[in-house]
């Protein structure tokens, strides 16, 4: 890959992975508009590692508490709030994992098109706007039930359709279910960790089995740039979301969807 391709694509992945604007919609733009080649499996693995590093470092304290609480519940020493959240995250990951295993080939073959991505970018952008305009509720992470987590998990499975936006659809579902904006985003970001691990691990296995040549400079740069940009986005999104709401992202998605249709 050319250096400029590595820089641009890594920044796109890092910036868009955790914002509700669809990373796949943005990654297809250089290919459709500029004629850039596909970034390849190795680079996909690299940016997965980068975004996973960002969210794991940002939520390191939460992750530590969740792991300790979950282990306590497993060993019969009682289940606290963090332990329950750990179980909820596991349960909410199952739908996306199953759907990914079953429908991965179908999605890659038939749904990774500009038309599909443009349509889902528009449709789920409007849905995000509707969810954000609901009467405000103050339900927090400690208030959610297993059923709430499972519904958000099912919504995450829908994000396997390119253009949906994993963070966008999970935040949308959480808002519909009454979570405040900040905790809707926090649950979405925590839920991304096992999904990125599974997706990145699967792609990593494919890479190993393919025995393809690896450009280690591109890999290292991709990891670093996607990690730093994703970390910055998580930080500012969580700090400003209650003030700015979802409307700026909705407007952006609508403009992006129209641009994609024009680019076809």
Curated annotation (Swiss-Prot):
It comes from the Bacteria. It is an enzyme of class 3 (hydrolase). This is Undecaprenyl-diphosphatase. It is found in: Cell inner membrane. Its EC number is 3.6.1.27. InterPro entries: UppP. The keyword Hydrolase applies. It is a multi-pass membrane protein. Belongs to the UppP family. The chain crosses the membrane at residues 1-21, 39-59, 87-107, 111-131, 144-164, 187-207, 208-228, 244-264. It catalyses: di-trans,octa-cis-undecaprenyl diphosphate + H2O = di-trans,octa-cis-undecaprenyl phosphate + phosphate + H(+). Catalyzes the dephosphorylation of undecaprenyl diphosphate (UPP). Confers resistance to bacitracin. GO terms for cellular component: plasma membrane. Keywords: Antibiotic resistance, Cell inner membrane, Cell membrane, Cell shape, Cell wall biogenesis/degradation, Hydrolase, Membrane, Peptidoglycan synthesis, Transmembrane, Transmembrane helix. GO terms for biological process: cell wall organization; peptidoglycan biosynthetic process; regulation of cell shape; response to antibiotic. Bacitracin is thought to be involved in the inhibition of peptidoglycan synthesis by sequestering undecaprenyl diphosphate, thereby reducing the pool of lipid carrier available. GO terms for molecular function: undecaprenyl-diphosphatase activity.
């Amino acid at each position: 890959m050319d250096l400029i391709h590595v820089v641009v694509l890594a920044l796109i992945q890092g910036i868009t992975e955790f914002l509700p604007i669809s990373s796949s919609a943005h990654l297809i733009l250089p290919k459709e508009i500029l004629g850039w080649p596909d970034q390849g499996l190795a680079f996909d693995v690299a940016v997965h590692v980068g975004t996973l590093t960002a969210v794991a470092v940002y939520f390191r304290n939460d992750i530590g508490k969740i792991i300790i609480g979950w282990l306590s519940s497993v060993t019969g020493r009682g289940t606290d709030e963090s332990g329950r959240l750990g179980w909820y995250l596991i349960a909410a990951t199952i739908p996306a994992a199953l759907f990914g295993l079953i429908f991965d080939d179908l999605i890659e073959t038939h749904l990774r098109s500009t038309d599909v991505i443009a349509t889902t970018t528009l449709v789920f952008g409007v849905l995000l706007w509707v969810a954000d305009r609901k009467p405000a509720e103050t339900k927090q992470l400690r208030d959610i039930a297993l059923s709430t987590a499972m519904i958000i998990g099912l919504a995450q499975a829908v994000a396997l359709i390119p253009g949906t936006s994993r963070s966008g659809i999970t935040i949308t579902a959480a808002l519909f279910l009454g979570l405040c904006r900040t905790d809707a985003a926090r649950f979405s970001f925590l839920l991304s960790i096992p999904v990125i691990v599974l997706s990145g691990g699967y792609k990593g296995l494919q890479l190993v089995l393919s025995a393809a040549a690896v450009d280690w400079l591109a890999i290292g740069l991709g990891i670093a740039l996607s990690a730093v940009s994703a970390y910055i986005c998580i930080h500012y999104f969580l700090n400003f979301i209650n003030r700015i709401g979802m409307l700026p992202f909705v407007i952006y998605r609508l403009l992006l969807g129209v641009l994609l249709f024009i680019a076809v």
